[in-house]
Amino acid sequence: MLGVAIGACAQNADYVTQVTCRLASPEMYGRGYDHHGDSIAAEFIRQEMIKLKLKPLGDNYLQYYNLDICYIEDNPTLKLKGKSLRPYYDYRLQPLWRLKKETLEKSKWNLLTEDFLFLGTSKLGEAVPLVPSGDQKLQCYVEILNPKCKAKAKFLDYDIHVVRERNYRTQNVVGYLPGESDTMMVFTAHYDHLGSWGDSLCFFGAHDNASGTALVLDIARLYSTTYPHRYTLVFMLFSGEEAGLCGSSHAARNPLIDYSKVKLLVNLDMFCGGSEGIAIVNATDSLCQPFVKQLIAVNDSITRLPEIKQRTNAANSDHYPCTSLCPAMFIYSLGGPYGGYHSPADDCQSCGIAQNYPNMIRLITSLIE
């Protein structure tokens, strides 16, 4: 089977690039919860699974669950001393739970209004989703890249609407290919991203994680025409990762499969790059070590990526909720090219997934053998 997989891999870049670019297109609205971008993306993924003749799990490939969300409605505007500031580039909204004492202390100035706490700063924090902060009315604070101005209410003019929605229904997308045994290899990725700020700004999320989603679908495509499979192959695409591993946590708590029969779960997140190789999170776990050694052996003899970096476990992607249920690891690419992390520049045009893809998929699919 490995020979079949390797021989077919050279043709895979077209499909994986096509899917990455479709998921990172404006019509997906950043795959967030404003404009129901998550549902648009989920339906696209579901239709791909149908085309590939995967068998459904859940409710016709969908596993529904609810979560509380926040998002920015309409086009936000913010002026400081009459000057219009650009969202993301000049200011960023951060969920209130991220606010730390040292952040306040390091801010050059601050101003509390009825709706927001504004902070003047010399460096903006990473863009993240707006996750509700309990029952508090104030859900987020605003970092402004302007440390020199002493802010006063009369100098600050804003029109920013943050919508909070409880029990928003979203979904994981899950399908499988039956094998000769009920032992399973599971491939996962999250398809959600940061969404958009009205019509003024979109986080396309090509690297994070349209690329990983496309890779999972391409593995399904590759094996959908090669029978019989030694193992049952399961493909899980999660929403809610950016909001705190919500989709994968729900899948772990409400299993659609018997995790005791999973040989290995491989989570794929951020694959537009790869010029420097790959990293494996949870590589040092005793249950994962045999698979890591297998990857190193294949890389040394066949794929020859520059590096396979081994990392200890961390709650930084969707493998983590499953680590107590089965052997689970998280693989991501090292190096470029890609357009940035949690940035509007993370678009299809900046994604270099095709450049390093043949050896990447050769290596990953070797785990199925």
Residue ranges of model-derived segments:
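Bacterial Sec-dependent N-terminal signal peptides
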Residues: 1-14
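Second-shell loop/turn segments in exported
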Residues: 26-36, 63-66, 87, 98, ...
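Soluble metallo-hydrolase cores and metallopeptidase-like ectodomains found primarily
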Residues: 87, 95-101, 124-205, 221, ...
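His/Asp/Glu-rich mid-to-C-terminal helical/loop segments that flank catalytic regions of hydrolases
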Residues: 221, 339-369
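Short helix-loop-beta-strand segments that form the rim/entrance of peptidase-like active sites
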Residues: 221-246
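Metal-dependent peptidase/peptidase-like ectodomains
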Residues: 238-338, 354
